[in-house]
C-alpha cells in the first residue's frame, strides 16, 4: 500500500494519541508514505523532522517522501485538485499493483475536499481513509501541543496508541459516505472562508445534527449584526452574545470584513466604528446630557449654559435651525478640551477616518489593503486593535467559532 497524506496540526501525535497520518501508518503499514506539506508545516519538518521521524520510529522500513507546497493559498480547493491528481497519477504509474490510500482527515479543509473529490471520481483509483479522534468526541484546543514547542519524544512516550490492544480508529469511506464527505469538505471550506450564507444553504441538505446547523446559522445572523435573531443560536455555548454590547459586535464584524478582504466595505464601515469609539471616550469625561438631546443631536439651549463645550465645538451648522450632529473632528475637539490625556491615543482614529472616508466616497478606485494603509496611516489590523482595546471586542470571535463548527462537522455521523 501507498499512503498520500497532507499534514495538519493534529499530526503526528496529539495529547490524546496518534494523529490521523500516523494512525493510518500504524494500521495499514504502507511501504511508501508521501507527506504533502504546506510551507508552514514544512518549516516544522525542517526544524526537527517530527513527521518523518514519527513514521520511522513506528515503521522503520517505510520510504518517506516529502512534497512541499509553497503557494500560500492553502484554502483554495480548486488549486489542490490538479496538484494532488498529478502526484497520485505518478504514484499509480510507479506502483501499478498497489492500493493508494488517501488520508482525508489531515490538512486544511480544502486539501481534504480535494482528496475526497479525486477519490469520488476514481481517477486514479484510490481508497479514502478517515480517522476519528482518539476521544471519539469533539477535540478541544488543549488536546494539541503547540507546534512551535513540540517534543516528539515526550509525545511518543505518552501516546496511548502505543499500548497493546489500542483501538483502530481508521475507517474506509464507502461510496455512499464519500458524497457526504465531499459535501462536508466543501462546507468546511465555506466556513474557513467566512461565507456563512452559502454554508447555511449547504448545511440545510447535509444531514448534520441540528446543533451544527444552528451554529452555522447563528454565525450568519451574527455576522450580519441581526441582534434580535442571533442570540438564541448561542445560548448555552462558549460564544457569549450580549445584544446590549452592540459596539463590540460591530467591531468583531468589522474584523470579519478584513478577514474576507472586503476592503471597500471595510473602509466604509470603519467610520461608524470610529465615531462610536470617540463618542464613548468623550462620554467618560463629559456627560452627554449636558449638551445632547435624546436623539444624540446638539441641544443649542443646553449649549448656551456650557461655554467650555461651546468653545470646543467651533463648527456649528450655518443655519441656526439645522439639526446639529457631531462628527469625528468634533469628538476629537471635545476630547482635547475635557480629556487631553486621551487625545494622543485616539487622534490616529480621526486621521484614519477622514482620509479613508474621502478615498471611499470620492474616488472611483479599487480599494485595497495597501491603499487603506497608505491613506489612513494605519494597517487595518492596527486600527482593529485600537477599536477592540476601547470596546472590549473579540477580534478572534469568528475564528474561534469556525474552529468549533469544523470540529462538530468532523465528528458528525455520515448516515
Swiss-Prot record:
CDD domains: Csm6_III-A. Residues 149-415 are annotated as: HEPN domain. GO terms for biological process: defense response to virus. InterPro entries: CRISPR-assoc_prot_Csm6, Csm6_CARF, Csm6_HEPN. Residues 1-148 are annotated as: CARF domain. One of its GO terms (molecular function) is endonuclease activity. Pfam families: Cas_Csm6_6H, Cas_Csm6_CARF, Cas_Csm6_HEPN. Keywords: Antiviral defense, Endonuclease, Hydrolase, Nuclease. Homodimer; the composite ssRNase active site is formed at the dimer interface. The N-terminal CRISPR-associated Rossman fold (CARF) probably binds the cOA effector. ssRNase activity resides in the C-terminal HEPN domain. NCBIfam families: cas_csm6 (TIGR02672). CRISPR (clustered regularly interspaced short palindromic repeat) is an adaptive immune system that provides protection against mobile genetic elements (viruses, transposable elements and conjugative plasmids). CRISPR clusters contain spacers, sequences complementary to antecedent mobile elements, and target invading nucleic acids. CRISPR clusters are transcribed and processed into CRISPR RNA (crRNA). Belongs to the CRISPR-associated Csm6 family. This is CRISPR system endoribonuclease Csm6. It comes from Mycobacterium tuberculosis (strain ATCC 25618 / H37Rv). The gene is csm6.
Amino acid at each position: 500500500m501507498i499512503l498520500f497524506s497532507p499534514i495538519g496540526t493534529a499530526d503526528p501525535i496529539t495529547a490524546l494519541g496518534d494523529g490521523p497520518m500516523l494512525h493510518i501508518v500504524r494500521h495499514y503499514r504502507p511501504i511508501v508514505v508521501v507527506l504533502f506539506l504546506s510551507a508552514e508545516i514544512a518549516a516544522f519538518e525542517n526544524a526537527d523532522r517530527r513527521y518523518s521521524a514519527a513514521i520511522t520510529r513506528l515503521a522503520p522500513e517505510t520510504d518517506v517522501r516529502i512534497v512541499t507546497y509553497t503557494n500560500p493559498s492553502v484554502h483554495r480547493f480548486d488549486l489542490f485538485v490538479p496538484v494532488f491528481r498529478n502526484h497520485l497519477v505518478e504514484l499509480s504509474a510507479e506502483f501499478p499493483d498497489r492500493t493508494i490510500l488517501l488520508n482525508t482527515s489531515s490538512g486544511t479543509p480544502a486539501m481534504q475536499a480535494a482528496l475526497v473529490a479525486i477519490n469520488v471520481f476514481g481517477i486514479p483509483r484510490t481508497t479514502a481513509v478517515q480517522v476519528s479522534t482518539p476521544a471519539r468526541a469533539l477535540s478541544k484546543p488543549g488536546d494539541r501541543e503547540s507546534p512551535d514547542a513540540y517534543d516528539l519524544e515526550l509525545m511518543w512516550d505518552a501516546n496511548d496508541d502505543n499500548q497493546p490492544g489500542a483501538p483502530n480508529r481508521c475507517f474506509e469511506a464507502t461510496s455512499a459516505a464519500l458524497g457526504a464527505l465531499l459535501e462536508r469538505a466543501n462546507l468546511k471550506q465555506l466556513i474557513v472562508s467566512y461565507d456563512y450564507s452559502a454554508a447555511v444553504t449547504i448545511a440545510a441538505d447535509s444531514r448534520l445534527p441540528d446543533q451544527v446547523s444552528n451554529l452555522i446559522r447563528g454565525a450568519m445572523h451574527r455576522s450580519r449584526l441581526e441582534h434580535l435573531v442571533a442570540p438564541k443560536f448561542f445560548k448555552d455555548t462558549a460564544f457569549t452574545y450580549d445584544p446590549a454590547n452592540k459596539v463590540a459586535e460591530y467591531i468583531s464584524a468589522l474584523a470579519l470584513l478584513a478577514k474576507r478582504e472586503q476592503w471597500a466595505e471595510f473602509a466604509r464601515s470603519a467610520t461608524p466604528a470610529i465615531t462610536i469609539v470617540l463618542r464613548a471616550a468623550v462620554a467618560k469625561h463629559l456627560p452627554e446630557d449636558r449638551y445632547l438631546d435624546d436623539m444624540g443631536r446638539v441641544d443649542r439651549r443646553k449649549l448656551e449654559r456650557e461655554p467650555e463645550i461651546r468653545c470646543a465645538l467651533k463648527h456649528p451648522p450655518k443655519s441656526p435651525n439645522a439639526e446639529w450632529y457631531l462628527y469625528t473632528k468634533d469628538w476629537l475637539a471635545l476630547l482635547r478640551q475635557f480629556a487631553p490625556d486621551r487625545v494622543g491615543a485616539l487622534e490616529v482614529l480621526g486621521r484614519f477616518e477622514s482620509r479613508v472616508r474621502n478615498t471611499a466616497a470620492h474616488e472611483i478606485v479599487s480599494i485595497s489593503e495597501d491603499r487603506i494603509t497608505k491613506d489612513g496611516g494605519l494597517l487595518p489590523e492596527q486600527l482593529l486593535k485600537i477599536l477592540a482595546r476601547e470596546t472590549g471586542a473579540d477580534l478572534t470571535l469568528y475564528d474561534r467559532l469556525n474552529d468549533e463548527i469544523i470540529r462538530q462537522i468532523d465528528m458528525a455521523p455520515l448516515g
